[in-house]
Amino acid sequence: AGTIAALAVKNGCAVRDVKVRDIQKALLDAGAYLQPYLDLSKDDPDFKMLQRIGCTGILHAIGKNVDWANQSWMRIGDTLIWDDLYLDEYYGVAHSDSKDAVKTSEFVILLSALSRKMPEDVTAITGIEPSEEQTLSRLDAARAIDTLLHPFDRDVDFKGNLK
């Protein structure tokens, strides 16, 4: 509540007019968790990025019950498969149930189409080299999506729906 009030004063607007993404960004900058992922510590350079991507729903976490604790994991070391990507809400790309690993060549083409950048520009920005044999981790995919497409910059309402 304090963060929202401070942002309202800073932006000169009513509390109800403070943007959700502004609240989330302020909380991240203060070191807060938006999602309870255990993959990375707050000190990790990829922490904020993973939180942003998780909030968009483009990559989903899994929950695990360990003893009396509920845990959430983004499985950042796992190989990205097509079924992992939920691009429909943000980009109109239908979800695939395929369990096939995403090849880096396919991923670069996908990002190229979504960003309207040439494949070589996608590679230059993300560092992902296209290959028919090479796959990528969920962490590398999240990094590339965050860096190139910036989905967290799209505003949402208080229910999480895109505006």
Residue ranges and their predicted role:
Residues 2-5, 27, 145:
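Short amphipathic C-terminal alpha-helix that caps PH/PH-like domains
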Residues 17-39:
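Intrinsically disordered, low-complexity charged/polar segments
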Residues 55-163:
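Terminal recognition/anchoring or ligand-binding modules at protein termini
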Residues 6, 29, 36, 120-124:
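Polar/charged alpha-helical tracts
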Residues 31-56, 62-68, 109:
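Acidic, Ser/Thr/Pro/Gly-enriched interdomain connector segments
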Residues 1-14:
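Internal hydrophobic alpha-helix adjacent to the cofactor/substrate pocket in enzyme cavities
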